[in-house]
Amino acid sequence: MSKKRLYEIAKELGKESKEVVARAKELGLDVKSHSSSVEEAVAAKIAASFKPAAAPKVEAKPAAPKVSAEKKAEKSEPAKPAVAKEEAKPAEPVAPKTEKVAAKPQSRNFKAEREARAKEQAERRKQNKGNNRDQQQNGNRQKNDGRNGGKQGQSNRDNRRFNDQAKKEQGQQKRRNERRQQEDKRSNQVAPRIDFKARAAALKAEQNAEYARSSEERFKQYQAAKEALAQANKRKEPEEIFEEAAKLAEQAQQVQAVVEVVPEKKEPAVDTRRKKQARPDKNRDDYDHEEDGPRKQQKNRSSQNQVRNQKNSNWNNNKKNKKGNNKNNRNQTPKPVTERKFHELPTEFEYTDGMTVAEIAKRIKREPAEIVKKLFMMGVMATQNQSLDGETIELLMVDYGIEAKQKVEVDNADIERFFVEDGYLNEDELVERPPVVTIMGHVDHGKTTLLDTLRNSRVATGEAGGITQHIGAYQIVENGKKITFLDTPGHAAFTSMRARGASVTDITILVVAADDGVMPQTIEAINHSKAANVPIIVAINKIDKPGANPERVIGELAEHGVMSTAWGGDSEFVEISAKFNQNIEELLETVLLVAEIQELKADPTVRAIGTVIEARLDKGKGAVATLLVQQGTLNVQDPIVVGNTFGRVRAMTNDLGRRVKVAGPSTPVSITGLNEAPMAGDHFAVYEDEKSARAAGEERAKRALMKQRQATQRVSLENLFDTLKAGELKSVNVIIKADVQGSVEALSASLQKIDVEGVKVTIVHSAVGAINESDVTLAEASNAFIVGFNVRPTPQARQQAEADDVEIRLHSIIYKVIEEMEEAMKGMLDPEFEEKVIGEAVIRETFKVSKVGTIGGFMVINGKVARDSKVRVIRDGVVIYDGELASLKHYKDDVKEVTNGREGGLMIDGYNDIKMDDVIEAYVMEEIKR
């Protein structure tokens, strides 16, 4: 026997596969899915179980759609003919429904009930589909009969129209049934609606009744009061009535007078359109609390608003009628003009120059027109926007009887005020500070050697020509107390630098050589110290040398006003030997003793102020300034104004080269972070924030520029002859470049002091840093030559100078520059030698050998390095050392020269501080042929 699958049975019956699977399981068959197969007998049994729910196929003759009554009957009851035909046809035997009920378990099974309800709904849907299918079959039979009967065209159109109409009516009936079901469900879920119109009408009627009742009560009260007053007046005599009437008239006149004098206060406009008259006897309607839930309360509030809107709906119309051509409104008297309130004049008036009339009027609470009138009476024509000077303002205040005081404005850009103001320091916060000691003296009298001995280092050995080139600041500790030392150059060219040192110092150590005595710079140092009112400690140095005569030194100093305490003076004398460290402890004890007598105090709690000791431009760091903190505490990231520039302290290093974050009073530090390099000797001050510091710095730079422009000499009748005479003079143009600002100032001042008849020196440009291309271009344009002091030209600048034939003079000792300039200007030049650079090398590695020194491994990058040539050590464009080679080797062999591109090793005579990336410049001196 053949088998059938369940989905094939479902397809034949027009059922879904899951329904057929469920029916098979109910019949006790072991099936798993719609793909399971069963015997034909079992398939017939499954099909028979669906027969009662399926719609029977009935052949019906096509009805003629001509009669309108039949169509109406079909529209009203479309399912009745099908039911009648089903009853007429004998049904096939099926299993009774009681079997299904008997198959259910006795206990209630909700899952089975849901499945049963789902099956019933599915059967009803199938039944409706069967009815539709029968109608379609009837329509198809009618079409066939029509074709066979010879009425093909008209019958087809009529049948099609009839079927479409039947489908449309069935769909409409179905939608109506669904809509009724949805409305029934919604009516069961939604609460009964409130009839707002009826509610509003009831509320309005209630309010009207309440208003009528209250109006009637007020009318009754008014009538009762009127009758009581009439009875009281009947009891009084006529004379008393007349007296009371007269009193009332007088009171009315007094009230009218007060109303005329006192202006009526204008109340702010308030919209009273929806406000009702208060009725204390009316009870609050609590109908909105009768129902629970926020939705009920919200609906009740909306009904209240509807009632209120209905009551006030005619408000705009009434308002328009009131604003119409009403004669009463036009005839109303205008309100009295309010008078200006009287303000008392101030007793004092603080003014500033340039105040306008309007500003003065606002301050003294008067009209500008009144002040303009007074000024006109005083003979001053002014408007309210015109500025007045201080004298005019004082005269105006005298006319008003006010005491005028000029307001003292604080200049934010003036940093000098911090050094002179008495209230800047807190007297309660003053603490003892280290003394600042300046070492002064003549050239080669041992100042730097003394300082070197104090610091236990050997920086004095490397000074070019034995002269300190710029100020150094250092700190030492003696007996647990700090002492700050400033070292100043001793040459005459550095007068301004010594003057700066004397202005910031507390004690001066005057170094005088015992074998040399008092020299010109010694006398100058004495004058600087006396001008600054600084005590002097005389250190008679070099007592170990033969021919030393300390007594002669004491006598010479006494002639210049420096008396020893042994001779009845106030200056301490100490005989020392800086070279052999003799009596150094005694000198330091004397310094601490003098400092203790002076009682040096400082306030570390205020913002830092102080002086610039030195400033320079560094290739990698930018502007670097050496500062001496005099008051307060300097911190990293402080906004600072230094001279005519400003910035923020980015990094701070002490005299040992170590990074620090805080610098107290009398502490020398080197800072970075400034926009430009300041001038040595400038004051600095820390501001509250960067904004105020920027404003102060820009204002100071602007003022300095204006001052420089105003200092430009103008031609006048007095200097006309001098100007014409100067035109006959020959001028020597010079461009000065140096390593530090102090050296630039010293060179400029020294060269301008050279007095040669018929020749003068003009400083075209002076700056800090290496010689660059712009300097060469400027020298070519101005026909000048360049003087470099402890700096070197860049390779590009050197090439450009050779191409443009610009002369560059490089020096490391200042008095040699001055002597050379004087000889050149006098035309007495001796045969001279010209420096010729023969090669350059770069240090790649260093090797320290005991008892020998430091060996530098180098590579020649340009030219050659010869054994008999002189060398310079250049670091970041600055000459560190200038000397001769002690050894030159290629591997282990001594060589006379190392050419370009080759490597070798060298040692420099007297210099061991060679570092990687140092540039070794080799040069020879060649005689210039004239």
UniProtKB/Swiss-Prot annotation:
Provide the alphabetized UniProt keywords: Cytoplasm, GTP-binding, Initiation factor, Nucleotide-binding, Protein biosynthesis
Its domain of life reads: Bacteria
Q: Which InterPro entries match?
A: EF-G-like_DII, IF2_II, IF2_N, P-loop_NTPase, Small_GTP-bd, T_Tr_GTP-bd_dom, TF_IF2_bacterial-like, TIF_IF2
The segments labelled G3 in the record are 487-490
Entries under CDD domains matching the protein: IF2_eIF5B, IF2_mtIF2_II, mtIF2_IVc
Disordered: where is this region? 50-196, 260-346
The UniProt annotation puts the region (G2) at: 466-470
Q: Name one GO molecular function term.
A: translation initiation factor activity
- Which residues are recorded as binding GTP? 441-448, 487-491, 541-544
Instruction: Name a single GO cellular component.
Output: cytosol
**Region entry G5, spans:** 577-579
Which residues does the UniProt record annotate as the domain tr-type G?
432-599
Question: Does this entry carry the keyword GTP-binding?
Answer: yes
Q: Where is the composition biased (Basic and acidic residues)?
A: 68-90, 110-125, 157-172, 262-295, 337-346
From the UniProt entry, list the residue stretches annotated as the region G4. 541-544
One short Pfam family name for this protein? EF-G_D2
**Annotated spans, G1:** 441-448
Q: Provide the family line.
A: Belongs to the TRAFAC class translation factor GTPase superfamily. Classic translation factor GTPase family. IF-2 subfamily.
Question: Which PANTHER family does this UniProt record tie to the protein?
Answer: TR-TYPE G DOMAIN-CONTAINING PROTEIN, TRANSLATION INITIATION FACTOR IF-2-RELATED
The protein's role, per its UniProt record: One of the essential components for the initiation of protein synthesis. Protects formylmethionyl-tRNA from spontaneous hydrolysis and promotes its binding to the 30S ribosomal subunits. Also involved in the hydrolysis of GTP during the formation of the 70S ribosomal complex.
This protein's name: Translation initiation factor IF-2
